Amino acid sequence: MSNIKITCDSTCDLPQALYAKYDVEVIALSVALGEELHRDGVDISAPELFAYVKESSNLPKTSAVSMGEYLDVFGKYVAEGKTVIHINISSSLSASHQNAVLAAQELENVYVVDSRNLSTGSGHLVIEAGEMVAQGLDAATIVARLNEMKERLDASFVLQTLEYLQKGGRCSSVAALGARALQLRPEIRVADGGMGVGKKYRGSMEKSVLDYIRGRLEGRDDIDTRRIFVTHSPMDSDVVAKAIALVKELQPFEEVIETDAGCTICSHCGPNCLGVLFFKKA
């Protein structure tokens, strides 16, 4: 059994089966619905979150994992003689990374990786870390490789509305107003650890999702086709099925993995959001 323990935060949005496969401990961010504080993925689900928004007209608020919470988790494994590799949502998007770094500085044998990404973009790194642990690589080598790999991540998604990003302080009011007025579905791309607006799509959500996927995958020869995530917030299952079918048609991925966006990600992207997240070739 390896003496390396992988941990990550709840924004990685991987299915429970993958966390179990690689023996990953997930540390939950917090989501506030009014005065009630919930733990992402532990005592609240995305459908429950959007039911609250619909009933109250209030948007959820998210908060980072505290330094103390990280110390508790990291310290538990260090006391067992393990080395911890922790993978975080981008430091540009949450204070979770900085809090994890501060906790790691209080302990020995804890490595904190800033994914410079979000959702299953970070999740890709969790899987790669798990595979390298299984291969018997040492922690320093794994961390160095993860820091190289994260530069090749291609993460983006298409939104029904910019309202959630705007009110969460992740998008300018002007951009939100323009997209709303023109009934555009904006594409958000992860770049340099943050988020920027890419293309804008017109028409129904289904048409926009399929146009977005063509734009990301069609005709490209720089894609690492080992694995792609199709990650989405609650939306029409028929649209998701058509999206997955189109992904398989456009590129010969060995694995196409559908995942549900967790409550932290949903709090900022809203319902009817879908993204494709993959590595580019080395």
Where in this protein do the model-derived segments appear?
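Mixed-charge interfacial surface used for oligomerization/domain docking
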Residues: 3-5, 11-21, 25, 30, ...
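Short beta->alpha junction loops
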Residues: 64, 115-116
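Class I S-adenosyl-L-methionine
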Residues: 37-106
